Amino acid sequence: MEISSHQSYLLQQLNEQRRQDVFCDCSILVEGKVFKAHRNVLFASSGYFKMLLSQNSRETSQPTTATFQTFSPDTFTVILDFVYSGKLSLTGQNVIEVMSAASFLQMTDVISVCKTFIKSSLDISEKEKDRYFSLSDKDTGSNGVERPPFYSSSWQEEGGSPHSHVSPDPGKPWNKYGYPPASQRSPQRPLAKHEQRKEPSKKAKHVRLPQPSEVVHFKPGKGEAQTDSGNHVSQSEEQVPVDAEVDPAPAGFQYSQGPDGIARSFPDDLTRLRFKCPFCTHVVKRKADLKRHLRCHTGERPYPCQACGKRFSRLDHLSSHFRTIHQACKLICRKCKRHVTDLTGQVVQEGTRRYRLCNECLADVGMESLPADLEAEQHRTAPADGDKDCRWHLSEEENRSYVEIVEDGSADLVIQQVDDSEEEEEKEIKPNIR
């Protein structure tokens, strides 16, 4: 029968012993502040202490002292309290320091908890940002009255009104939108090009949200239909300069009626930059870039080098390190591409080409019986000082079989390879050249 409360009770007793400095056989010095602890507890909770105490396992009778300068005493207090109580006190101010210290002490549980804390804080910031953008979409006035969408005075059709502003004409469809025909409009003075360039502010002041009091939707009553018809024409003429000076909408602009029209008309440049670092002002567009940026704060190096064990925070830094440090000036066999040394391989020169082969590849090509006094044999078999050709040193039978005739059909050139002097070679080759 297992009692689950026994482990927590035992941990509480060890924590009380640590606070009262009872049976503490290890001292940790962090920037001048001394912490007392038990070696068995530190050995079981940290990979770094496990490696450190294993080296000093023979000196168990003497107390052990460890000194750290990589983190602050407050950070180590949080970690030591977690070791003895299982409770990790994380805040937005100390999570980076705690995660960096846990990475140094090789405490994987603390690192995973810190990562979860950072991710949850990012999710909270994302929710707040989404809430901010959702509130900004509801473009309301200062008095609580919702503002109408853009271009509502000239693009919105009045449906169901018993009396229209101007009598409808089937040949002139603009009348039903409350826009007067060309004959009723007063001539407007067009803006000159230099005025448009010099005074952009005058032109831009017309492009704005109409206030609730400025909406030009005039619906006369039954008794006022005839008396107010002239007033409506004058109001339409006053509205013409505003609508005439508004720049035409771009091709990608979408007109819509309703509160969602404003949100869809604006570009979504603000919503693209949605990943902000919770510890600095850095903002990125992708979550992977934010994850890589957080390693600058946490000190995490997840990519180890397989050759020397050095760790890196980015994969491209690891590949550059391996290429420049471990593969620079590396001798490899040309055939099997394995690493060779002066003892496990030899340099082979074939004409002007020089390459290196390992002993196994030399045995495969039948060159395992190279003479030990290679230089002396080269002096005995060298034809002349001016002959720079370096041939393979083979036996007499192989030399006889190596003599062959190479025919070139394109130039009708026949070359016979024999071991003769230069003068005899020239006499034999010159008559064959056509």
From Swiss-Prot:
InterPro entries: BTB/POZ_dom (IPR000210), SKP1/BTB/POZ_sf (IPR011333), Znf_C2H2_sf (IPR036236), Znf_C2H2_type (IPR013087), ZnFinger_BTB_dom_contain (IPR050457). A zinc finger (C2H2-type) spans 275-297, 303-326. Its main location: nucleus. Keywords: DNA-binding, Isopeptide bond, Metal-binding, Nucleus, Phosphoprotein, Repeat, Transcription, Transcription regulation, Ubl conjugation, Zinc, Zinc-finger. GO terms for cellular component: nucleus. CDD domains: BTB_POZ_ZBTB8A_BOZF1. It comes from the Eukaryota. May be involved in transcriptional regulation. It comes from Mus musculus. The gene is Zbtb8a. Residues 192-202 have a biased composition (Basic and acidic residues). This is Zinc finger and BTB domain-containing protein 8A. It is found in: Nucleus. Pfam families: BTB. SUPFAM superfamilies: beta-beta-alpha zinc fingers, POZ domain. GO terms for molecular function: DNA-binding transcription repressor activity, RNA polymerase II-specific; RNA polymerase II-specific DNA-binding transcription factor binding; transcription cis-regulatory region binding; transcription coactivator binding; zinc ion binding. Residues 226-238 have a biased composition (Polar residues). The modification Phosphoserine is found at S161, S167. There is a cross-link at K172, K176, K193, K430 (Glycyl lysine isopeptide (Lys-Gly) (interchain with G-Cter in SUMO2)). Residues 134-238 are annotated as: Disordered. Residues 24-92 form the BTB domain. Disulfide bonds: none annotated.
